[in-house]
Amino acid sequence: MESQQGPSSPAQSNEPEGNGNPHPTASTEVTVEGPQQAQGAEEDCGVLAPTSSLLQVTERRQPLSSVSSLEVHFDLLDLTELTDMSDQELAEVFADSDDEIPQNEPPPGLQLPPFPRAGYLRSPSWTRTRAEREKKHLSDSELHGGILDTFLAAERSKEN
């Protein structure tokens, strides 16, 4: 029976050739070669490549390695600028992060009463610096306008 089924399997693969199958020989090669290349042939649409599965694993890992930790941190910074500061837990996180860097410490002899955490809300450092930057931009444009006015006035006085 095996000898009868052996010749019948190539005959079955030849029948799809007559029906217009674009890859008739791939199915016969897959059955002859073995299970490892059969998986690669199915994944590559009939092209036999013994290392195709290794290449696919590498391709799956590439998007994870293309995102650097710096990009993730910048994305988190963008998210913090858009957060609602009315959220008490989030405000405490920002207040704790500012406490790590002491800026204006009182003298050692003078001790202030501790503030309760629930009622203590301090603006995070990034909001203070952003407000200062916005003020500088406004004053810069005012300064440029003032410089232009004084320059034009000086030019007019020279012409007269």
From Swiss-Prot:
InterPro entries: Dysbindin. Residues 1-47, 98-122 are annotated as: Disordered. It comes from Xenopus laevis. Belongs to the dysbindin family. Residues 104-116 have a biased composition (Pro residues). GO terms for biological process: regulation of signal transduction. Residues 1-39 have a biased composition (Polar residues). This is Dysbindin domain-containing protein 1. One of its GO terms (cellular component) is cytoplasm.
